[in-house]
Design a protein with these regions (language model features):
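Bacterial Sec-dependent N-terminal signal peptides
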Residues: 1-29, 178, 381-395, 400-401
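Exposed, low-structure sequence patches enriched in small/polar residues
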Residues: 24, 48-52, 70, 131, ...
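Transmembrane beta-strand segments of Gram-negative outer membrane beta-barrel proteins
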Residues: 33-57, 87-89, 274-276
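Surface-exposed strand-loop-strand hairpins of Gram-negative outer-membrane beta-barrel proteins
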Residues: 50-72, 104-106
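Extracellular loop and loop/strand-boundary signature of outer-membrane beta-barrel proteins
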Residues: 59-63, 115-120, 161-164, 194-200, ...
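Surface-exposed extracellular loop regions of Gram-negative outer-membrane beta-barrel proteins
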Residues: 76-97, 179-190, 269, 275
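Surface-exposed loop and membrane-interface regions of Gram-negative outer-membrane beta-barrel proteins
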Residues: 84-137, 159-160
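Surface-exposed coil loops of outer-membrane beta-barrel proteins
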Residues: 143-214
């Protein structure tokens, strides 16, 4: 019994909470880039501070246990001139800090370290990056971004394609993004350029292409069916790349349908969602031990006010996703050249509660329990507290406003 004692607080929290759910609160107070701009502000100051404390109790043959205590901070000036088409320029700095850390790998992006981003022996005392974003809204519901993108949880990717924990660890995405938000249609496509190379550099050129789109069909005021297509493609290499065995391309895609029904309760509606996805994986470059794979994901969830809960089940065959959660992978800690299993599978129960949510801040807690029989230790869990504060200050008003 002592072996599982550290799961007891998490189990009780999941059991006695009205509803708990997936982690959808990351920067939830931040409006989508397609939302109408403030028509009165000419020059503003934006501050986005995210404090987090997350503890992962993971199966040792999949990924090591660890704790993430720290913050992400962004401060930028925003300039919104009065033009026929709304445009905005943001300039600032971004900082990632882990409590107790005294040095950080001097890589360009914090994913898959230290295989290709950096030489492995270069460090910096402070993780500070420039922030730049230029955006335009060419039509209602449309936005085009150059520079830093609106990424992470805003892409709405499923967990086998994108690990929610990257909202706390990955650097901001940079490149080009085109986004549309309509009443029934959603489109988000982007290129995240993670690594640029000059001749003689030891690391690779690398970028990620992503697509997240959905089309909804309303059968009644309370019933909706949404068809979704999601894809993430990674490429590493480049014409100037001089390293051997470092040109690779991976593609992950998912096609799914999500049904939702809203129950009209006296004060606040209760929403039920059920989804089914088919997933595919393909590789060029012989980096991983599997070239092709597939999987299925089934989800069911409830949301009520600021509470959410989700139950999901995944089953795959030789499936690998570079950005996905570790429990959906056919590989483990033994390395990329060795398949831990041909059949990765897990059942997950997750929940979150937005304790406070407003236009300027979000305070939430979440927890999750994973059961993965393909691992020697079949139970993993996490628990997390998250506080995001995003004040915006007007420095100059437009004339006549």
């Amino acid at each position: 019994m002592a072996k599982y004692s550290h799961f007891l607080p998490l189990f009780l929290a999941l059991l006695f909470a009205p509803d708990l759910g997936a982690q959808t609160y990351y920067r939830s107070e931040e409006p989508h880039c397609t939302a109408p701009k403030d028509s009165t502000t000419l020059l503003g100051l934006d501050i986005v501070g995210e404090g987090f404390f997350r503890n992962d109790e993971y199966a040792s043959d999949l990924v090591a246990d660890y704790t993430l205590p720290g913050y992400r901070l962004r401060a930028n000036l925003s300039y919104r001139p009065e033009t026929r088409l709304p445009i905005e320029l943001r300039l600032g700095v971004y900082n990632l800090y882990y409590w107790g850390a005294t040095r950080y790998p001097a890589a360009l992006a914090y994913q898959d370290l230290p295989y290709w981003r950096g030489d492995g022996d270069r460090y910096t005392r402070l993780r500070l990056l420039p922030y730049f974003q230029a955006s335009i809204q060419p039509a209602a519901g449309w936005a085009i971004l150059l520079g830093h993108l609106q990424g992470g949880a805003k892409h709405r990717l499923i967990e086998p394609l994108y690990n929610p924990e990257l909202n706390l660890t990955a650097d901001p995405e940079m490149g080009l993004q085109i986004r549309y938000e309509g009443q029934r249609t959603r489109l988000d496509t982007w290129v995240d350029w993670q690594s640029f190379i000059f001749r003689g550099d030891k690391h690779q050129e690398a970028f990620v292409f992503g697509l997240s789109t959905a089309q909804a069909f309303d059968f009644s005021p309370t019933d909706r069916l949404e068809l979704q297509l999601q894809a993430v493609a990674h490429h590493r290499g480049g014409v100037l790349n001089e390293r051997a065995d470092t040109v690779h391309t991976w593609l992950n895609a998912a096609l799914g349908a999500v049904y939702s029904h809203r129950f009209a309760l006296p004060k606040h509606p209760l929403t039920l969602q059920a989804g089914l996805y088919g997933l595919a994986y393909s590789q060029r470059g012989e980096h991983y031990a599997s070239d092709k794979g597939w999987g299925f994901l089934a989800t069911a969830g409830l949301s009520w006010r600021r509470w959410q809960t989700e139950l999901s089940h995944f089953y795959g065959y030789d499936f690998i996703s570079p950005l996905g959660i570790p429990f959906a992978q056919s590989i483990g800690r033994a390395g990329r050249s060795h398949l831990l299993t041909h059949h990765p599978r897990y059942t997950a129960w997750q929940g979150s509660y937005r304790i406070i949510e407003s236009e300027a801040y979000t305070f939430g807690v979440s927890g999750g329990l994973y059961i993965h029989p393909h691992s020697a230790h079949s139970i993993s869990s996490f628990i997390e507290a998250y506080l995001s504060i995003s004040p915006r200050f007007t420095l100059l008003h437009r004339r006549g406003r």
